[in-house]
Amino acid sequence: MKTLLLLLLVLLELGEAQGSLHRVPLRRHPSLKKKLRARSQLSEFWKSHNLDMIQFTESCSMDQSAKEPLINYLDMEYFGTISIGSPPQNFTVIFDTGSSNLWVPSVYCTSPACKTHSRFQPSQSSTYSQPGQSFSIQYGTGSLSGIIGADQVSVEGLTVVGQQFGESVTEPGQTFVDAEFDGILGLGYPSLAVGGVTPVFDNMMAQNLVDLPMFSVYMSSNPEGGAGSELIFGGYDHSHFSGSLNWVPVTKQAYWQIALDNIQVGGTVMFCSEGCQAIVDTGTSLITGPSDKIKQLQNAIGAAPVDGEYAVECANLNVMPDVTFTINGVPYTLSPTAYTLLDFVDGMQFCSSGFQGLDIHPPAGPLWILGDVFIRQFYSVFDRGNNRVGLAPAVP
């Protein structure tokens, strides 16, 4: 009888997970930082943006100006494709759980970054309309601004009608010029959306395009294009993780924010001994935390400043400590190979730390951000129906 009951529970969970799954392939490209480093331009980039990544801090606030740390996108490697309009115009985007707006470059944008990317042409779409509202997103090096348009947005067979989105007319700095992506599709809660725009996933749910009010993310560790990486709308795929999902309640419905019990380095609690807050963020490449804490963490793993960032000796990976995030009573351990980014410069190995200081001040912070370095190791499910995040060890 007990065996039958367990089987029924497993079947129920499988049914909940599957529904009708809509899979969005995520392609992995070399990050902007890797490209700049390969061209020996990384130091010049830091200087031109007045950035010292060793001391980097940035004040973030959750007001209508929606401050975003631009530096988060430097290491982004996973991108997908969407289309806007009739007939469809294709764009490469970051699917970002740390923001809630969709924006792409406008054909009317004259910033250098727009000239190197796909631009939306409203006059070419028969389903386009313009509400007439402006928008602005503040980044560390300036503001991205433009107008809000409305059109149908398609993502791998899911077509949202009447989706409002930003058409950028100005884009800040040099960062977006060399970026692999055209725009960003935010998957955060509506409270984060600039201009009161309804996010894409909320419209998917409202228009009954997904069977289940959840989506999931698998980021392959395969450096050759990240084969198999995908975003799933409407459920999750058991083949992408081992064991069972551990569900963690969302503590604040803006980012996908959860509570951390503690953070251990080498088996010893070093941070958050009385708990702290974190967000699971597909739009941040590294793991970030308060700058003073991250400095201690870099010292603990043996990372040292090199050319404006923290690096470790590649030969020391086998003796460096594990870093463990305890969440809802469950330990999530990152080995040194998991939290270290490997690159090649002039044929030589270069290993940089996957941790970055970022100060997010009240009322939004302080926050730790569990970005792609974490998500590559732990399959992540974002459940809007129950306001929770599911985590389990990812299958390589």
From Swiss-Prot:
One of its GO terms (biological process) is antigen processing and presentation of exogenous peptide antigen via MHC class II. It comes from the Eukaryota. GO terms for molecular function: aspartic-type endopeptidase activity; identical protein binding; peptidase activity. It is an enzyme of class 3 (hydrolase). Glycans are attached at N90. CDD domains: Cathespin_E. The keyword Protease applies. Keywords: Aspartyl protease, Autocatalytic cleavage, Disulfide bond, Endosome, Glycoprotein, Hydrolase, Protease, Signal, Zymogen. The active site is at D96, D281. Expressed abundantly in the stomach, the Clara cells of the lung and activated B-lymphocytes, and at lower levels in lymph nodes, skin and spleen. Not expressed in resting B-lymphocytes. Glycosylated. The nature of the carbohydrate chain varies between cell types. In fibroblasts, the proenzyme contains a high mannose-type oligosaccharide, while the mature enzyme contains a complex-type oligosaccharide. In erythrocyte membranes, both the proenzyme and mature enzyme contain a complex-type oligosaccharide. Two forms are produced by autocatalytic cleavage, form I begins at Ile-54, form II begins at Thr-57. Homodimer; disulfide-linked. Its EC number is 3.4.23.34. It is found in: Endosome. This is Cathepsin E. It catalyses: Similar to cathepsin D, but slightly broader specificity. Residues 20-53 form a propeptide. Residues 78-396 form the Peptidase A1 domain. The lineage of its organism: Eukaryota, Metazoa, Chordata, Craniata, Vertebrata. May have a role in immune function. Probably involved in the processing of antigenic peptides during MHC class II-mediated antigen presentation. May play a role in activation-induced lymphocyte depletion in the thymus, and in neuronal degeneration and glial cell activation in the brain. It comes from Homo sapiens. It holds the Pfam family Asp.
